[in-house]
Amino acid sequence: MFLALDIGNTNITVGLFAMKDKKVLPEPLKVWIMSTVKERTFDEYATLLMNMLFYDGFDAKQLSNFAVASVVPSLNAVFEELIKKYFGEKTFFVNSKNCGGLVFAAGNSKETGADRIANVVAAYSVYGDSCIVIDFGTATTFDCINSEGIYIGGAIAPGPSISARLLNLKTEQLPRVEVKKPLKSIGLTTVECMQSGLYFGYTGLVKELIARIKNEMKIKHIIATGGLAGLMFDEIEEIEIILPYLTLSGVRIVWEKVI
């Protein structure tokens, strides 16, 4: 079996894939999510992983291939050691060199996050045409690939959860609130006002960036992924579809192309 890991700043998404004739099947058998905690040791992460496998009826001994897209460099060695110690295997890391042949138009490709690489590789694999991939995570990333499969670049904005947290941390009177769609834009309470600003202000940000990107290049498809994609989907009509496991799929595809 094949294990793909998307190590983000808030969560680590783990996808288990079956293999047949040395090829990874496209749909994950199971997906788990664990919190990203930089202080955890590889033994602690291994315990979590083994427990998830065990309780869902999977045999850890059947795992033989591992690939990681990480935007938390401090955890790379942790998972590399985990996989080496508990499974006796090497870890494949998605990066600008291990990118499955993705061509970068310009700029410093070394700075492009592994999750962003995985996202555009997966999107182009699905559509074979120009796309914007919007990943609603800790940060919200916009990544553009053209009809020739060349990665053009994109934009990065703070995610709504970060904005909500900072409003609470950097002020004395504003509470910490859940990011949710309010019933109307004019709030009556402080919480309602904050939720209006966070939700409608944020969806406005996304719509504006989509419009500006479309003014600069031809776009056929707009895809969303990430933890808050479902919350934003109804308000942003430009988004065509949500693909919740896009990053894991990209990790799988890159691994197959390189290995």
Curated annotation (Swiss-Prot):
Pathway the protein takes part in: Cofactor biosynthesis; coenzyme A biosynthesis; CoA from (R)-pantothenate: step 1/5
Amino-acid positions noted as binding K(+) in the UniProt annotation, renumbered to this chain: D135
Chain sites annotated for binding substrate: G113, A114, D115, R116, T190
Keyword Metal-binding: yes
Listed GO CC annotations: cytoplasm
Reactions performed catalytically: (R)-pantothenate + ATP = (R)-4'-phosphopantothenate + ADP + H(+)
Co-factor requirement: NH4(+); K(+)
InterPro entries, alphabetized: ATPase_NBD, Type_III_PanK
Keyword Nucleus: no
Coiled coil, from the record: none
Cofactor note: A monovalent cation. Ammonium or potassium.
GO molecular function annotations of the record: ATP binding; metal ion binding; pantothenate kinase activity
Known EC number: 2.7.1.33
Cellular localization per UniProt: Cytoplasm
UniProt keyword annotations, A-Z: ATP-binding, Coenzyme A biosynthesis, Cytoplasm, Kinase, Metal-binding, Nucleotide-binding, Potassium, Transferase
Binding site for ATP: D6, I7, G8, N9, T10, N11, I12, T13, T138
A Gene Ontology BP annotation from the UniProt entry: coenzyme A biosynthetic process
Active site (catalytic residues): D115 (proton acceptor)
Function text: Catalyzes the phosphorylation of pantothenate (Pan), the first step in CoA biosynthesis.
Annotated protein name in UniProt: Type III pantothenate kinase
Name of the gene: coaX
